[in-house]
Amino acid sequence: MNEYNFSDIEKSTQEYWRKNDTFKTIEDNTKEKFYCLSMLPYPSGTLHMGHVRNYTIGDVIARYQKMQGKNVLHPMGWDAFGLPAENAAIKHKKSPYEWTKSNIAYMRSQFDSLGFSFDWSREIATCDEDYYKWEQWFFIQLYKKGLAYRKNSVVNWDPVDQTVLANEQVVDGRGWRSGALVEKKEIPQWFLKITDYADELLQDINKLDNWPEAVKTMQINWIGKSKGLTVKFKVKDSNQEIEVFTTRPDTLMGVNYLGIAPEHPLALKEAKSNSQLAEFIEECKKTSTMEADLATQEKKGFKTSIKVIHPISAETIDVWVANFVLMGYGSGAVMSVPAHDQRDWEFAQKYNIPLKQVIESNDNKLKIDLEKQAFTEKGILINSGEFDSLNFKNAYQAIKKYLTEQNKGYETTNFRIHDWGISRQRYWGCPIPMIHCDDCGAVPEKEENLPVRLPTDVALTEAGSPLKDIPEFINVACPECGKPAKRETDTFDTFFESSWYYARYTCPTANQMLDQEANYWLPVDKYIGGIEHAIMHLLYARFFHKLMRDQGLVKSDEPFKNLLTQGMVLKDGAKMSKSKGNIVDPQELIDKYGADTVRLFSMFAAPPEQSLEWSETGVEGTNKFLRKVFNYAELNKVIFAKNITLESQKLTKEDKKARFEIHSNLKQAIFDFDKSQFNTVVSACMKILNTLNNYDNLSESVKVEGFSILLRILAPFTPHLCHYLWQQLNLGEDILHTSFPTVDNNALEKDEFLLVVQINGKLKAKLELDASLSSNQVEEVVLADEHVKSFIDNKQVVKVIYVPQKLINIVIK
């Protein structure tokens, strides 16, 4: 008997796929389409187990849908721009382009070795001119609509990487890659007006029925819509006003101070004549601006000489510069009510600022101790003059009316989200297609001149982008007046590329951004990726889709119908990482066990949404199962050569039992496939093989039927072995183009059933009975059974309770 030689099987199968162009998408608009997409990887150079799991999930779904007869699109590409490639290129003394393309070639070969069914004819790399040309074109359309703009902005500046960092990239005040202390710096930045779409992005979350609730909640919180009042505080002895937004106007009478951001114009103005304040502002520049960090870091402040007038009481209120107030949110100022806000309370305790209680609890029994903490619940107003005794709802309306009539405030809908800063001061990215002219200002490049090509012959250093030092790149004629001008040297944030790649896969060679194929394929039917992308990538992609819709490029409102967020791969309870020394190399596993084993383990060890704990024993177990599958085929290959057909009238009792188990497991597998519960689909495969092995006298026709069902369920998981056995057993040419098995409902109808017999609720017997018996007949048979009679003779049968074809309980006394 031949042994399972996974290496030969996988090589020959992959060669078959290559020769026959098996995975090329066939345009067939008569079929139902299914667009399956896994998030494109950054070409780091090698695959890790997280990649294997993520892309195996997508491949299983794509193969299953293809066997369901659908027209499947399953593409792959590369998120190729970005700082990591630039830094790696500097380190290895190569160009980023050369480094990236080399990594892509190797990773593509690794993908192929795992048997992924990607249509490589649609491959894109975001660093290719044919790709980024169209995002430059799109940016120009957005600029013409006023949706892209440039303004000075205070940013997180990494002095080592010489680029702007998002708030999320500042960790403990340091750059997430360089480790350098981050500085606050005001520089001109390009932005997209995502705030114009904030309401729609929020409302359309209701359309995302097949997205995880956790992701939807994160997006809702990130967009952060809130209704409140903007209150005007007049600066004493000045015509200026400080506006603050609050969702709790009921606490307005308890304002003890205003907090302003270190970058607030009033703070900067006073710092010119106050060296201590200037030092404090410099210190604030070195702290994190991430909200999570702001919540936990020490609250620090500096009392200014600025005073404001309370809009209702006319009291004089101090203004403090506070390290927890961000200039990028709202007006860069907050009203502080220490008695009713915990952060304000902590600040007041530190600087001995008095508290003024203006809310008491609805619960008279609740004792409020402001010496221990702030009272933050809504309640009844006290110490608030004419607003005393009002509850929150009535106080909100009364204070709104007063402020509006006095022109001291107005109702506002506020959003936590702010416009997306898309400028990066690095080389390895898509050039922003704008030109700066002294006379005309910022002018878009002429569309016929696109793409604005990224120069490849450059000398890279760690000190920022070399583009500003390349005369032939930077020195151009103004597209409007023809005078000498300067090209923009910033490049796009790499999230710009990854926000529309899914659409370009539908028409990767089109001589326009998107063509009519986009509306056939979009939206994506199944999108697979990590939950860590919940906010940035997934929100930006939703934003881009709406921008493309409004440009007439797509018709749908949302890019992704169904989102699956896979869990991490853990080892020893921790995420695999080089620093922890717990990395498992997928290539070593493929060499030792074969790609099919690696794929099957990654699907069987845990449901896709949960973290998977790495287990060498588990890998060995899945390999053992595949050897059993191979051995069953070897032992029974003579039977398959006979071209046997199933004849139901010739089935034995054992055949019928086996078919019931096989088709029950098939039914469960189909249900679990549709729910993406792949671990239980694999369990169903194992049960079917057990059924085939456990019955000694199965008819050959049942063996053929059962094993062909097993191979087709297993094929999306272990495509090499199933393809090989399908051909070896003369079941067909290519299992991928075979229809997925359907359940024979006749097989689920039992001739017999096992009845549990209880007497006074205690198990006494199990009887196998004819399924055609009526309730009365079942009762007669049971009461006549010799074993049962031994318990009820000389006893009075009070009643008989029968649960059809499951249980009968005889009550006696």
Swiss-Prot record:
Record-level Gene Ontology MF annotations: aminoacyl-tRNA deacylase activity; ATP binding; leucine-tRNA ligase activity
CDD domains with a match to the protein in the record: Anticodon_Ia_Leu_BEm, LeuRS_core
Xref: SUPFAM superfamilies: Anticodon-binding domain of a subclass of class I aminoacyl-tRNA synthetases, Nucleotidylyl transferase, ValRS/IleRS/LeuRS editing domain
Gene3D superfamilies in UniProt: 3.10.20.590, HUPs (3.40.50.620), Isoleucyl-tRNA Synthetase, Domain 1 (1.10.730.10)
Main location: cytoplasm
Signal peptide positions (record): none
Cellular component GO terms, alphabetical: cytosol
Pfam families: Anticodon_1, tRNA-synt_1, tRNA-synt_1_2, tRNA-synt_1g
Motif 'KMSKS' region mapped to chain: 575-579
Keyword line: Aminoacyl-tRNA synthetase, ATP-binding, Cytoplasm, Ligase, Nucleotide-binding, Protein biosynthesis
Top-level class of the enzyme under EC nomenclature: ligase
Binding site for ATP: K578
Chain positions of motif 'HIGH' region: 41-51
EC number of this enzyme: 6.1.1.4
GO process terms (BP): leucyl-tRNA aminoacylation
Catalytic activity: tRNA(Leu) + L-leucine + ATP = L-leucyl-tRNA(Leu) + AMP + diphosphate
Similarity section: Belongs to the class-I aminoacyl-tRNA synthetase family.
Name of the molecule in the record: Leucine--tRNA ligase
Organism whose genome encodes this protein: Francisella tularensis subsp. mediasiatica (strain FSC147)
Gene: leuS
